[in-house]
Amino acid sequence: MPGTLVYVMGPSGSGKDSLIAYARRKLNAPYSLTWNASVYARQGLRPVAFARRHITRPADAGGERHYALTREEFQSRKRAGEFALSWESHGLYYGIGREMDSLLARGAVVVVNGSRQYLPEAMAKYPALAPVLISARPEVLRSRLEARGREKQADIDERLSGAAVRLHDIPGLVRLDNSGALEEAGRTFSDLFLRLRRMPTPQAG
């Protein structure tokens, strides 16, 4: 596929949602996978879209905007082949709509909030994906998880234990520390997409 899939990962509390929202505002990019690509073409830029995830979590649970599904709805859509990517984490199911593939085929930059554990499967399906790892110091992770008030203490401890997952020998991996002010990491994060959208749109062979 000639487009670029940017696969963003990081432990709970690293601030992935906040960074993605920051970059989306900076680029004035859509929070879904539909837009008028011809407008971007006239500007000489590659389209950038931030995928809105399907999650088995209530719509009013806080955090990112997502498509809320029951487990039964999720599994039905998965069986129907409606997801380009899907995984399970901390008792929840996550999916990215298959419309992502048509956008990549048109040369778009598609940004996905992914999972570190699912990275090998994602790389097998999209070998040219651009992986980005967001991190933060352990005490910052705990403080953020406690502040958002979504999890019980035992759940927070479980998420923090998973924060120690290490990624090694990942080609092209971009690492970004988000322990400080959002604007600090946000500028660096946004610059990545500004560079990608200015790149010539690859031509399909």
Q: Which residues make up each language-model segment?
A:
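ATP-dependent small-molecule kinase phosphotransfer cores
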Residues: 42-110, 116
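Post-Walker A helix-loop "phosphate-sensing" segment adjacent to the P-loop in P-loop NTPases
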Residues: 25-50
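ATP-binding Walker
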Residues: 14
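P-loop (Walker A) phosphate-binding loop of NTP-binding proteins
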Residues: 9-11
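Conserved phosphate-donor/acceptor-positioning beta-strand/loop module used by diverse small-molecule
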Residues: 110-115, 124-148, 163, 176
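Short hydrophobic/aromatic beta-strand immediately N-terminal to the Walker A/P-loop
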Residues: 5-7
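Small-molecule kinase domains that catalyze NTP-dependent phosphoryl transfer to phosphate-bearing small molecules
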Residues: 147-205
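Walker A/P-loop
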Residues: 17
